[in-house]
Amino acid sequence: MVRFITDHRDEYGVEPICAVLPIAPSTYHRHRAGQIDPARRSARAQRDDVLRVEIQRVYDAHHQVYGPRTVWKQLRREGIRAARCPVGRVMRGRGVAGVVRGRAWITTTHAADGGRPADLVDRQFVATRPNQLWVADFTYVATWSGFVYVAFVIDVFAHRIVGWRVSASMRTDFVLDALEQAIYARSGTGLTGLVHHSDRGTQYLSMRYSDRLADAGIAPSVGSQGDAFDNALAESVMALFMTEVIRRRGPWRSLEAVEFATLEWVDWFNMRRLLGPIGDVPPAEFEAQYYQQAAVA
């Protein structure tokens, strides 16, 4: 509006234009003076100018998925003092918003009831140390060349993704590869007392998968098929993945494109993404704090 008045003031004058627009001449002159000499702008406007640059930097650095609360938390971590309300106001003024999480799709084909492991978790997705409880799940992604499937194994303690795999097939090999990656990544920290929890998917109840858990000394736990609450933490991470990567950056051309995006996102998620349930720190940092405290205990 200020620009419109400036563009037409020589022809019509400021006051006549303001008379038909919802703006007072004094407001226009104040804004115009601030444009000509930024030092004459209000203290709040000058603070917003500085904050606007920092908000955009954080927003871009974190894949443009953070909302006002998480942007504010990241600014505080970096030592930039700002109240939460101004962060939200500046973001709204720029039309910048975080992504809205959707739900993950149910992909489970359940196995027969006979002989499945007991539910050792009972919807209590808490752990007091790393390698105490893992949860596993997978979802599907539509690409131009057909569906591909993405599996995760997540350590509940810090919500860290310890294994993942992208495949064109839903066969057992696919989720078994994600498990193998998790076992390899965590083998140096000990797997004693570890519980692996999943839904009743045929892949997770297969003989090969069960044997691999047994070989590694991992106790299996299985919830009820089709009930998201029985694998709520895995569903939560999967929903983040679908919202922050798949739905936002699609459509997808190929398995390779999904695989590269997943690799990039998992690294960012583990190393940099702030997670509210663990105190607004990244999973890797939360784990590092645990090991530091354990070393001096």
Predicted features along the sequence, with ranges:
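Charged DNA-binding/catalytic regions of mobile-element recombinases
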Residues: 1-297
